[in-house]
Structure formats: structure tokens, C-alpha cells
């Protein structure tokens, strides 16, 4: 385990978790109860029986501040998706979704791309640019990217819509956030703030269980 894992999964919760049984042997808990909702910190994506889910990651500092706001009877501040190390923009579109946008610079017919939207990898992007060379939408390109930085120099671009042609934006929809709640079952959430609200309610239940255990 990473050294900070036990800050997220407090040892004081161990005694109040419900542990599963495997042939008379106690194994892992039915679910863990972290101090921050890891589904919002890490994001998640998957397909289950009859349901699919996509939740983007959010900034742990924003999540923490909204928990403090709740404790102080203040409203949540809207949170936007956040990707560690991403240097581009994240903004809300007119349909209520989110758009991630890379970074580029245009000099005549040359385009320097120094950041791609999250989830768009440099190898895949290189292969995509190869198809644009075949279509004669660009003349050539050089890939100087490293494991740390994106660096594509695209020459001879002749298109009309640089963002669409060079795939410099990616849309994130928040209409498919299906998650399993321990007492409610499968729930469809409309926002990250709604997920956080349910988490806080459950987290408070477990603080109460810890308190009751100390008393009794």
C-alpha cells in the first residue's frame, strides 16, 4: 500500500465495516468507507448488466472544500472535471456537458500541438495524423513527444476547422453516471455534487457507528 493510503481509508473504520465470509474465513469488507469519495477522485468507467457508467475525475481539493461547505451549512460549489497534469482547458458546453481542449499554436500553415485532450494518446494521435497525410489535409508532421510532454509539429495544414480536423477537443457527458449505493441499489446521478451528497450521508452514518462503538 502507498504510505498515504491509510489517510484515505482510516484504520478507525476497520471495526465498523461489514466483512464478507468465505467458507468461514473473514475476508475483505462488503465495501470500504474512504474519507473522500474515490469514485469522484479517480473517476470510473464500465459496463454492467443493463447499465453502463462514466464518471470523470474531479479535483480532490474541490471535493474536500465542498465537504467543508456541507459541514458549515454552505451550498456546494459546482465542480468541473480535473485531470492531473493536464495543461489544457476544461469548460462547460451549452448542453450541460464538459469539453476538454488541448493546446496548439498556428503559424501560417504550421500547427504546433503541445497538449491533447485527456484520453487521446500520442501513439493513437500519430496514427490519426498519418491518415490526414494520406487524405492530403496536412503535408507532413513530426512527433517529438516524450512520456512527459506532447509535441507534434504539423506542416501544410489546409483544412477549415482546425479543432475538428486535428481532434483538439473532446466532449465529456455527465448523463450516464450510474453507481451502486449500499442501501438504494443502482442510482442514476445527475451531477458530481449529487454523488457527493449521497457519499456525505453515508460517511456520516459510519462516523456515528464509530462513536456508538466507543460508547458501548
Predicted regions and their residues:
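Charged, surface-exposed alpha-helical interface/stalk elements
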Residues: 73-216
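A short, contiguous, amphipathic alpha-helix enriched in charged residues
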Residues: 1-27, 113-137
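Active-site-proximal segment of RNA-dependent polymerases
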Residues: 12-39, 76-98
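Long insertion/accessory domains within large nucleic-acid-processing enzymes
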Residues: 18, 22-56, 61, 65-68, ...
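Generic, well-ordered alpha-helical scaffold segments in large soluble proteins
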Residues: 3-8, 39, 54, 63-70, ...
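Short beta-strand elements
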Residues: 5, 37-42, 97-106
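Conserved glycine-bearing catalytic or ligand-binding loops at nucleotide- and phosphate-handling centers
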Residues: 1-4, 47-100
Amino acid at each position: 500500500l502507498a504510505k498515504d493510503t491509510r489517510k484515505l481509508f482510516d484504520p478507525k473504520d476497520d471495526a465498523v465495516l461489514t466483512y464478507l465470509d468465505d467458507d468461514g474465513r473473514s475476508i475483505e469488507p462488503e465495501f470500504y468507507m474512504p474519507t473522500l469519495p474515490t469514485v469522484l477522485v479517480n473517476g470510473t468507467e464500465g459496463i454492467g448488466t443493463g447499465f453502463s457508467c462514466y464518471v470523470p475525475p474531479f479535483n480532490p481539493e474541490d471535493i474536500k472544500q465542498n465537504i467543508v461547505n456541507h459541514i458549515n451549512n454552505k451550498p456546494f460549489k459546482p465542480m468541473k472535471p480535473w485531470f492531473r497534469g493536464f495543461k489544457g482547458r476544461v469548460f462547460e458546453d451549452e448542453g450541460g456537458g464538459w469539453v476538454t481542449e488541448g493546446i496548439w499554436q498556428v503559424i501560417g500553415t504550421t500547427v504546433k500541438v503541445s497538449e491533447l485532450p485527456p484520453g487521446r494518446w500520442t501513439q493513437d494521435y500519430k496514427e490519426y495524423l498519418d491518415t490526414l497525410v494520406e487524405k492530403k489535409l496536412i503535408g507532413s508532421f513530426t512527433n517529438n513527444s516524450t512520456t512527459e510532454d506532447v509535441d507534434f509539429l504539423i506542416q501544410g495544414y489546409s483544412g477549415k476547422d482546425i479543432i475538428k480536423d486535428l481532434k483538439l477537443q473532446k466532449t465529456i457527458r455527465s448523463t450516464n453516471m450510474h453507481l451502486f449505493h449500499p442501501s438504494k441499489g443502482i442510482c442514476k446521478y445527475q451531477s458530481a455534487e449529487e454523488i457527493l451528497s449521497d457519499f456525505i450521508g453515508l460517511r456520516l452514518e459510519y462516523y456515528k457507528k464509530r462513536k456508538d462503538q466507543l460508547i458501548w
